[in-house]
Amino acid sequence: PVHDEHIAAAQARFPAAQVDPFKARNEMVHRYLAGLLGLCVLAIFAVSRRLPRGRGLAAALLALVVLQAALGMWTVTLSLMPVVVVAHLFGGFALLSMLVLLRVELGHDRPEPARPAEPGLVRLLPLAWLAVVVLLAQIALGGWTSANYAAAVCHQLPLCESGWSARFSLRAAFGLPLGHETYEFGVLPYEARMSIHVLHRIGALVATAVLASLVLLCRRRAASVRLRRLAAAVGALLVLQVTLGVRPSVVE
């Protein structure tokens, strides 16, 4: 609602909630962009029917868009239930990954310039797969931290305030808070939020160590300048992400 009488009617119908035009505008922009993305994926699916490859991936993309639309709806109707919010987040990452895979799949028909062999990187494949798993786990922990409004609990580095270990509870961190009317601003007690935040910081330390090792080894063993630059770009993104993560605690 944008008019005063409509806002008053909405406020009277839902007295426990407060109308926030700024949040409503952001939500509508998100919905319009999501709808545009859905139309683009539908067009990709239609065009892929006439292509020799990429049909299965395009069909999976369309199915994932439908699932994402449902998760987006449940995010609202279930009042920001954390498990739905995290699933919606992972759906977005999966969409991006599948679009990149589709681009790679459709680009196989084009002739590629000869590239130098990379025997030095073959042994790094297990470490690369480990980095992918660790990164996905850290993204999940970050989404769980945000969905449960646990980001502002710990203010000291490297893990939390003194005495956190005595109150840490793994069961509380991964408990599913069900049956609440709304999950906005979080419903978990301090111990659970603190445990979630500590796990996220531990995950950040592990992810930083694994990714930094992979970047340094790729820079050292890669034969092509292109791959060395790509490794440097990943390292720069890692430094940026760590900086953004520790900045709130440093500023405070």
Task: Locate each region found by the language model.
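Polytopic transmembrane helical bundles with strong interfacial aromatic enrichment
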Residues: 1-252
